[in-house]
Swiss-Prot record:
GO terms for molecular function: 2-dehydro-3-deoxy-D-gluconate 5-dehydrogenase activity. Keywords: Carbohydrate metabolism, NAD, Oxidoreductase. The active site is at Y159. Pfam families: adh_short_C2. Belongs to the short-chain dehydrogenases/reductases (SDR) family. The lineage of its organism: Bacteria, Pseudomonadati, Pseudomonadota, Gammaproteobacteria, Alteromonadales. This is 2-dehydro-3-deoxy-D-gluconate 5-dehydrogenase. Involved in the degradation of 3,6-anhydro-L-galactose, which is the major monomeric sugar of red macroalgae. Catalyzes the fourth step of the pathway, the reduction of 3-deoxy-D-glycero-2,5-hexodiulosonate (L-DDGal) to 2-dehydro-3-deoxy-D-gluconate (KDG). It catalyses: 2-dehydro-3-deoxy-D-gluconate + NAD(+) = 3-deoxy-D-glycero-2,5-hexodiulosonate + NADH + H(+). It comes from Pseudoalteromonas atlantica (strain T6c / ATCC BAA-1087). Its EC number is 1.1.1.127.
Length: 254
């Protein structure tokens, strides 16, 4: 049974892998046997922490930089990475941003950047990498969704809209590609101890309210995403399509 979870010989492209959830996923995939292509807006091209940790596991790592809010930069990255890696087996759409402002003050610049990074770039990357997977009749695409795929959030209208759309995109792509050998799914993190939640964790009242709703009684951490990512990237999930896997300590069950 364990061989179904092996990613030996696979190549995984992980966006937003410099730190946090993306780094945790990249390391989990490497631990399962995959070589890693990492890309983030500010990832060091050589010598990054994630590269060093992947290589310490005996796996290969190639780093790229890309500003996912810049359409031209995105297409240039796609052209480069496809030339360097003709066969990408696993795509993890994890790169994202969150910009906070009350809806009445949420300017076009904030809205556009969040939608470009969290939705538009992820569709384009999935389309361009996914078409190669469809041609081979084999591939795995994993999106990072959110609790706000299901809930509205507070003072993050662009983020909530983008993550709600990701839930629909996962199902839309799955409807087209599940019968063509490509599994498209998502992981929805709960409240995780990362840079994105620093303001919440430092707000003692808000942090206490959040912890009070999580049945497991703790914030999540990047290591909590290794197992779910390996599962969705592996043959063990060959009949899983269009799913959004909650990794939230039980939050959505309350």
């Amino acid at each position: 049974m364990l061989e179904k979870f092996s990613l030996e010989g696979k190549v995984a492209l992980v966006t937003g892998c410099k730190r946090g959830i993306g780094k945790g996923i990249a390391l989990g995939l490497a631990e399962a046997g995959a070589d890693i292509i990492g890309v983030s807006a500010s990832l060091a091209l050589e010598g990054s922490d994630v590269e060093n940790e992947v290589k310490a596991l005996g796996r290969n790592f190639k780093g790229y930089q890309c500003d996912f809010s810049d359409r031209d930069a995105l297409y240039a990255f796609i052209k480069e990475v496809k030339a360097d890696f003709p066969k990408i087996d696993i795509l993890v759409n994890n790169a994202g941003t969150i910009l906070r402002a009350p809806a009445a003050e949420h300017g076009d610049d904030l809205w556009d950047k969040v939608i470009d990074v969290n939705l538009n770039s992820q569709f384009i990357l999935s389309r361009e990498i996914g078409k190669e997977m469809v041609a081979r009749q084999s591939g795995k695409i994993i999106f990072t969704a959110s609790l706000l795929t299901f809930q509205g959030g507070i003072t993050v209208p662009g983020y909530a809209a983008s993550k709600g759309a990701i839930g629909q995109l996962v199902m839309a792509l799955s409807n087209e590609w599940a019968g063509k050998g490509v599994n498209v799914n998502a992981i929805a993190p709960g409240y995780i101890d990362t840079d994105n939640t620093q303001a919440l964790r430092e707000d003692s009242e808000r942090s206490a309210a959040i912890l009070g709703r999580i049945p497991q009684g703790r914030w999540g951490n990047p290591d909590d995403f290794k197992g779910p990512a390996v599962f969705l990237a592996s043959d063990a999930a060959s009949y899983v399509n269009g799913a959004i896997l909650l990794v939230d300590g039980g939050w959505m069950g309350r």
